[in-house]
Regions:
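Residue-level signature of the cytosolic catalytic core of signaling kinases
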Residues: 1, 13, 71, 166-167, ...
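Amphipathic helical "hinge" segments at domain boundaries
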Residues: 1-61, 68, 137, 144-147
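Short glycine-centered, acidic/aromatic-flanked micro-motifs in structured strand/loop junctions
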Residues: 7-9, 66, 131-132, 207
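Short, conserved acidic/polar surface loops in the N-terminal third of protein domains
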Residues: 18, 47-48, 73-75, 101
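Bacterial carbohydrate/catabolite-sensing allosteric modules
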Residues: 26-31, 55-58, 76-230
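Short, flexible loop segments at the rims of nucleotide/cofactor-binding pockets, characterized by
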Residues: 39-42, 66-70, 105-107, 166
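Short gly/ser/thr-rich secondary-structure transition/capping motifs
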Residues: 45, 71-73, 198
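Short, flexible, glycine-rich and Lys/Arg-enriched loop motifs at helix boundaries
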Residues: 65-81
Length: 230
């Protein structure tokens, strides 16, 4: 083996994270590295504890997926210390500006902009955005793309943004807040959140997509099998 590489990811309940883990582990294995999956759960091993364990084991590098590196209000000294120790690190899904590391992410801003433009093309005028905490880089980028498209395509229409959690329950809560504002199109920050929005729409006696259009984000493998498929 060329060395141990740690893969630190959030909980596995969101299907997008097992997808990340599988793809990254396959790439590491094919390059001769030994992947070590480190999952974070409430009350479980923390990111800092995983970092110390990996450093003690002489890890050849650490990959962080959707972790504290994306929190603009968080403490980033842990990543600076890794660099000082000579441990290579890579971040995936957003990087706070103060972190100096190889960073990879989808274009959240462009995705949100395209989603809004699509809804506008369908005739929607009151379009809502359901995203996670705004201190996180991906949420900031999605908000920027949403606002850009709204200002360009619907300059007289107010913004309708709900900041919630990237969970099914968070999506359902967002729907309960956006529907009374008259939103007929809702862009979501994740697929799991979108499923919650759909349930919230139905709980309000409305139909998807006949009454309300919903767009998710992640391209999770099970999403095409939902009713309706996202």
């Amino acid at each position: 083996s060329k060395g141990l590489v740690g893969l630190v990811i959030p909980e596995l309940s969101n299907p997008i994270f097992p997808m990340f883990a599988q793809e990254i582990e396959q790439l590491l294995a094919s390059s001769g590295h030994t992947p070590l999956l480190c999952t974070q759960t409430p009350g479980g091993t923390s990111e800092d504890e995983y970092i110390e364990m990996l450093v003690e084991r002489g890890a050849a590098g650490i990959i962080f997926v959707s972790g504290r590196h994306a929190d603009t209000s968080g403490d980033v000294t842990r990543y600076q210390r890794l660099r000082e120790r000579g441990v290579p690190l890579v971040t995936i899904n957003g990087n706070a500006p103060t972190i100096k590391a190889a960073a990879f992410a989808t274009d959240d801003r462009a995705a949100a902009r395209i989603a809004v433009e699509h809804l506008i093309s369908l005739g929607h005028r009151r379009i809502g955005l359901a995203i996670g905490p705004m201190r996180m880089v991906p949420a900031q980028r999605k908000h920027s793309g949403y606002e850009e498209a709204m200002r360009s395509g619907l300059p007289d229409e107010p913004l309708h943004v709900v900041e919630t959690l990237y969970t099914y329950e968070g999506g359902a809560n967002a729907a309960q807040l956006l529907l009374p504002q008259g939103c007929t199109g809702i862009v979501c920050g994740s697929d799991i959140m979108a499923l919650g929005v759909i349930q919230g729409v139905r709980s309000g006696g409305l139909r998807v997509p006949e009454d309300v259009s919903v767009i998710g984000y992640d391209d999770s493998p099970l999403i095409p099998m939902t009713d309706p498929p996202l």
